[in-house]
Amino acid sequence: MISALRTAVESFIAREKLPPAYVDTVATWFVPLAEDVLRRAATSQRTLVVGISGSQGSGKSTLAALLVLLLKEMLGLRAVSLSIDDFYLTRAERQRLAGEVHPLLATRGVPGTHDVALALQTLRALGSPGQVAIPRFDKACDDRAPRELWPTLLAPVDVVVLEGWCLAVPPQDAAALLAPVNELEAEEDAAGSWRRYVNDQVAGSYAEWFARVDYLVLLQAPSFERVYEWRQRQEDKLAARLAAAGQTGTRLMDAPTLRRFIQHYERLTRHGLEALPAHADVVYALTPEQTIAACRKGGPGQSSAATVA
């Protein structure tokens, strides 16, 4: 890694409060990834959309930001990162869905709670000349940020990095929807109308959205049980940051609240753990400690110990 790039990466590591040894992770796993993206972008006839899919706590947003840095600093590409979280429906729109379809749709997260039309419009705009406003969602208010607070950039860009917990997940078969997967579904979706609605969205408008992904990277958790542990770890870190800043932390979730919250995501997370590896261009197998154990490129049977090139 050249000195200027190493300095940029070390600054990124400090900002993200990652361990210093993460610089070796970048050199081993993610510099080759950026080089592979460059090769794809060089032959693409449009703005390349790189998808990063993975469960909660898997490191999607960190990798998305890092990949944009590498593409810019190392390879000179114009790149921007987006999260599917930025395209949530407004709180009022979700409340309407909760009244018309199912109360669980008031909670943001699952397919059916995003503005897919806005997401597709944004992707199209990033591939055409002009100023583009990037939507932002304020999780503290559980609502879309005012448009005047959306950052803008000059398009077209070479690469869009889109990350999300359910990105590229395929719909389930109807038979798989019959039995509840957890207490939330058993008690609050006994008839199955919520999970059927969510699955219909995956098969419908979300399929068009996910089809825009040209190159899919999967951060593969070892199991769903680890997802809860990772999400709890995120909550603990947030509590520490709030305490250090002298804030009350009233928005933090206690363990029962967090467990219920994650149950909204459990069905599609489990399904993605099984279905996505066969569809991803690159799969990073994660350890329980959230380090990379191995990399596989191009579907099953293509393991690599140190590179995606």
Give, region by region, the residue ranges found by the protein language model:
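Conserved nucleotide-sensing/catalytic segment adjacent to the nucleotide-binding pocket
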Residues: 21-22, 80-83, 87-141
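Conserved NTP phosphate-binding and transfer environment spanning the P-loop NTPase/kinase superfamily
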Residues: 2-3, 17-23, 27-30, 166-309
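Post-Walker A helix-loop "phosphate-sensing" segment adjacent to the P-loop in P-loop NTPases
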Residues: 69-80
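Phosphate-binding/switch loop-helix module in NTP-utilizing enzymes
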Residues: 122-169
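Extended hydrophobic secondary-structure segments that form protein cores and membrane-embedded regions
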Residues: 49-55, 81-84, 216-218, 283-284
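Hydrophobic positions on the alpha1 helix immediately C-terminal to the Walker A/P-loop
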Residues: 63, 67
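Conserved lysine of the Walker
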Residues: 60
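Extreme N-terminal, non-catalytic leader segments
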Residues: 1-49, 55
